[in-house]
Amino acid sequence: RFTAQSAPGTWPAFWTLTSIDRGINGDELDIVEAYGGVGKGNPNHPGYSITSHFWGQKEPDGTYKKRFNKRVPIMELGGKSYWSTPFHTYGLYVGRDETIYYFDGIEVLRHTTNDISKEKPLFFLINYAIGGISGWPIDLERFGNASDMYVDYVRVFAENDIQYSIPLPEKK
C-alpha cells in the first residue's frame, strides 16, 4: 500500500525479478509503474502501467517472447481517485498456472505464468525514480522542488506447495 506525488518526471514502481544478473534470462513483473505528470498544467495522470517482461527468452519458433502490457484506467474501474492522491493497494499473485495483478482488490490483468516464474523465486523491489532513462523533463516546483513516496505496508505470502528448481535460503 503506497502513495507518491505525481510531478512531471516522477516514476514510482513496485515490481519483481527472478534474477538481478543481466546475463541470465529472467522475468520482470511490473505490478505498478506510474509516470508522474503529463505537463506542467496537468500533473496527475489517471492511470498506471503493468508490464511483464521475459528478458532474453524465446518462443519455440525462435522469436523473442512478447511481453504483456496494460494501461490501468483507475477511474474506469471504479477507483475513487488517481494513483497519486490517497493510498492504494497493488497486488500480484503468481501461481503455477496464472499470474494475476490487482488494484485496490480489483483484478486488472491475468496471464499464463511464465516458466521461469514457475521455476525461480521472485524478489520484489519498490522504488521512486526521478527522471528515468528516457530523459523525461523533471518539474518538482509544485511540490517545493522535492517529491516523496510513502509506503504504508508490504505483505508477501507464499504457497506451501510451490517447489523451485533452485534451493531457497534456509529459515533461521
Which positions does each model-derived feature cover?
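GH16 jelly-roll
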Residues: 1-172
